[in-house]
Amino acid sequence: MSPCKLLPFCVALALTGCSLAPDYQRPAMPVPQQFSLSQNGLVNAADNYQNAGWRTFFVDNQVKTLISEALENNRDLRMATLKVQEARAQYRLTDADRYPQLNGEGSGSWSGNLKGDSATTREFSTGLNASFDLDFFGRLKNMSEAERQNYLATEEAQRAVHILLVSNVAQSYFNQQLAYAQLQIAEETLRNYQQSYAFVEKQLLTGSSNVLALEQARGVIESTRSDIAKRQGELAQANNALQLLLGSYGKLPQAQTVNSDSLQSVKLPAGLSSQILLQRPDIMEAEHALMAANANIGAARAAFFPSISLTSGISTASSDLSSLFNASSGMWNFIPKIEIPIFNAGRNQANLDIAEIRQQQSVVNYEQKIQNAFKEVADALALRQSLNDQISAQQRYLASLQITLQRARALYQHGAVSYLEVLDAERSLFATRQTVLDLNYARQVNEISLYTALGGGWQQ
């Protein structure tokens, strides 16, 4: 039988060769089967949780515009996309080793005598060479599978960068809003303190107040000016952070006060299964890495067995181009080769040990990813109710402080209390207004964190 007829048979036999990789089994999830949920933000238990697209989750149109711009220009996302392309090319490169390699060649030579003999010897040759490795024990197949899983893991890593970018842009935008609102409160408070200073100064001239009260009024003015400078710096830093995420340094949107309706609340069914974590890209990335490590064990095991390669070719040679392709000038060759590992000082065993240890490391990494993801969701759920309770209490406290300040001012005007009582009420009101803003921002960030922890942010 000619080599040309043997080659397709060998190819089919090699491609259906056995695999020495262990059967893959997904590790059990090292977390509770369900999340512990309060009644806050729950929907009907019969409803399954579905991640809303980010265009639905975020209500504020400005946030949507910024996210779209970041997805187009952000350098981290662009780098992640390039890594996916690199991993895809690497997979194609490795997978190509499983198939026959066919190369053509042609050459010509001219030679003569340096002593003056004019006779010139000419020689022309051409040929085709084919080579193929018989993958009886699945070494090449498993190496290709490992690269395929690495490629899929890189795709999931790119998804994770995408989701993180959506989250970071939204949080950065809300942080800009917070910094602007804090600055507005500080400037408003400064105007109130200046009015109080003018009033105390007027009373001092009439003898109804004293120098101590005037100095106290001047002191809170300077303290507030310091706070304004701090808030201005925070606003500038928030703008810089947002521009970095956007990947461009164009004009940013005008900062506005914090809007509590900028996003939807994440609605979760009672008895939410922790299986939902398996849709997170970081966990899917870890699983693909585990499957790659599993395939590498198969490749390492195959190194203990013989490897067979086939080389075949046809060629022609002639001193004249016109007769180069005559049948009488052609020849063929077929060279099978087998390599049997006999002694390599434990190299193959060491490679297998490394592959098995790395597979065990991948299992641990996969389990860690799941535990971290479970904690992120559990923390966000626990903080959700706490923040709502804190905001309600602080708003009631704020209303009480507004009444207290009004009464303190009235009593001071009638000489019933010292100016220190007014200052204490003003300071408390100022601090509480800032606290309410901080809590509202924290609630927004926590809702985004919960949305992201459940794998949201990939789809539009």
Curated annotation (Swiss-Prot):
What is its subcellular localisation? Cell outer membrane
GO terms of biological process kind: monoatomic ion transport; protein homotrimerization
Q: Where do we find N-palmitoyl cysteine lipid attachment?
A: C18
User: S-diacylglycerol cysteine: lipidated where?
Assistant: C18
Signal sequence annotation? 1-17
Membrane topology (UniProt): Multi-pass membrane protein; Lipid-anchor
InterPro entries noted in UniProt: OMF, OMP_efflux, RND_efflux_OM_lipoprot_NodT
One molecular function GO term is: porin activity
What Pfam families would the database entry show?
A: OEP (PF02321)
List the induction conditions. Transcriptionally regulated by CusR in response to copper and silver ions.
What cellular component terms from Gene Ontology apply here? cell outer membrane; pore complex
Q: Which UniProt keywords apply?
A: Cell outer membrane, Ion transport, Lipoprotein, Membrane, Palmitate, Porin, Signal, Transmembrane, Transmembrane beta strand, Transport
What Gene3D superfamilies does the database record attribute to this sequence?
Outer membrane efflux proteins (OEP)
- Description of how the protein assembles with itself and partners: Homotrimer. Component of the cus efflux system composed of CusA, CusB, CusC and CusF.
Briefly state the protein's biological role. Forms pores that allow passive diffusion of cations across the outer membrane. Part of a cation efflux system that mediates resistance to copper and silver.
Identify its protein family.
Answer: Belongs to the outer membrane factor (OMF) (TC 1.B.17) family.
Indicate what this protein is called per its UniProt record. Answer: Cation efflux system protein CusC
Q: Which gene encodes it?
A: cusC
